[in-house]
Amino acid sequence: MAASRSLVPDRLRLPLCFLGVFVCYFYYGILQEKITRGKYGEGPKQETFTFALTLVFIQCVINAMFAKILIQFFDTARVDRTRTWLYAACSVSYVGAMVSSNSALQFVNYPTQVLGKSCKPIPVMLLGVTLLKKKYPLAKYLCVLLIVAGVALFMYKPKKVVGIEEHTVGFGELLLLMSLTLDGLTGVSQDHMRAHYQTGSNHMMLNINLWSTFLLGAGILFTGELWEFLSFAERYPTIIYNILLFGLTSALGQSFIFMTVVYFGPLTCSIITTTRKFFTILASVILFANPISSMQWVGTVLVFLGLGLDAKFGKGTKKTSH
């Protein structure tokens, strides 16, 4: 994306980043729900999509190809000295987080998944304190407390609400918790790479997705999921089109996020992605008839308020002295 300085005027760069992130991940979210929660076929023989490993495999292949193109045209001067084993280790948590997140959609609705994934500051802070010995400002803890309160309100259902799936905290929520924890580990690994090897975003995107492709490729062959998916795709060929678009919007969205961080910093990027997630929940409610109670809306607002305040006031960290 280095070439974008000459290709895009300064005054248009922020609107381009905002629209790029918003449109790509907005459509990504719609496709994700359509693929994973849609019904295929007619009548009593309707089927659901259960091929989480294959979905993430295709996504990683497209991400790796896209990163390779970016390096080839815009990032040829950078020499990557990051240790190979670090990429391999990071890819394990990266794959686990994405597979868990997609698998969770078989058990929880999309607003719950988006809200759950929005709680990333919680494991990041916990892992930062325990593994990296970081100290955070009071504002950070208050923001995380606000997020926790919002999630608690969203998950609490005192009585049955018409049209809302009634369930206790179960396997879907555990998958989201696992995804969040693995996201935190991925973030710690990526911070280590940047701090010790000055790893570029495009090289990181390429190598982590390449290793993830190898892991997932072995997984879908070993479990036989690949052949089941191909049979499913033969019965419902439109799924291929949706999955390819899903992977493409993911890769484009990542590139716009990196561009936003480079030119405007993590604060602006955090505000844009937080806004996008809120409107993705709204779209899911409207387009896919995922009703949300008034208490859940209050919880949703609290979560995004906590995320917004965290982006503004909770970024200061310092390492403890040893």
From Swiss-Prot:
GO cellular component: endoplasmic reticulum membrane; nucleoplasm
Residue window of motif Di-lysine motif: 318-322
Membrane topology term: Multi-pass membrane protein
Compartments reported by the entry: Endoplasmic reticulum membrane
Parts of the chain that traverse the membrane: 12-32, 51-71, 85-105, 136-156, 168-188, 210-230, 243-263, 285-305
Keywords: Antiport, Endoplasmic reticulum, Membrane, Transmembrane, Transmembrane helix, Transport
InterPro entries named among the record's database cross-references: SCL35B1-4/HUT1
Enzymatic reactions: ADP(in) + ATP(out) = ADP(out) + ATP(in); UDP(out) + ATP(in) = UDP(in) + ATP(out); UTP(out) + ATP(in) = UTP(in) + ATP(out); dATP(out) + ATP(in) = dATP(in) + ATP(out)
Function description: ATP:ADP antiporter that catalyzes the exchange of ATP and ADP across the endoplasmic reticulum (ER) membrane. Imports ATP from the cytosol to the ER lumen and exports ADP in the opposite direction. Regulates ER energy metabolism and protein biogenesis. Appears to be part of a calcium-dependent ER to cytosol low energy response axis, where calcium efflux from ER to the cytosol triggers ATP import into the ER lumen to maintain sufficient ATP supply. Provides ATP to ER chaperone HSPA5 that drives protein folding and trafficking in the ER.
The protein, known as: Solute carrier family 35 member B1
Gene: Slc35b1
